[in-house]
Amino acid sequence: MSYTIHGIQHLGVGVPNHESAWKWYRKFFGMDIPLFNDEAEAPLMTIYTKGKVISKRAAMVLNIKGGCAMEVVSPTTFKASNSETEFQLGDLGIFVGMIKTTDVNKAYDFFKTNNAKLLSTVLKSNYGQDTFYVKDLDDLIWQILPANDFYTNHNHITG
């Protein structure tokens, strides 16, 4: 059995502290190539901000090994905070981000050695593949999955 993810260009991640979050994503996910990194008003976000135009800092960052990208976004006109609603798997939106690795066990050891907030040990996915779950600095959940479709031989454990 196999799986394919279709239609996701990149994953936007809202964080309260842009600098520390990006540092974590560089360290654990290899997101070290900025495509842009800027601060600007965000008029398209008014549906999420009760009609108010806010300013935000955003960086689109890329992992050169696997080609995945994420947009790290942090408001600058207010301090971001977690929702008062406790979301559950199956609610609207993306609940778990997914990151590829060439070796799940080596990735797990890297995350453990570097004191990441591991949510599981290495376990079997529904597809019978090794996987594990981790939380980032802002308690967002990520699943680390095996893959062999990488663009380069970059030495980072994830891609």
Predicted regions mapped to residue ranges:
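Vicinal oxygen chelate
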Residues: 1-4, 13, 36, 68-70, ...
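Core segments of cupin and vicinal oxygen chelate
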Residues: 14-67, 106, 113, 123-125, ...
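A short, acidic/glycine-rich surface segment
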Residues: 42-46, 79-84, 150-154
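Acidic/polar N-terminal loop/beta-strand segments that form early-domain functional surfaces
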Residues: 63, 73-75
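Acetyl-CoA-dependent GNAT
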Residues: 75-78, 147
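Glycan-recognition patch characteristic of GH18 chitinases/ENGases
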Residues: 86-88
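Eukaryotic phosphotyrosine signaling hubs
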Residues: 92-96
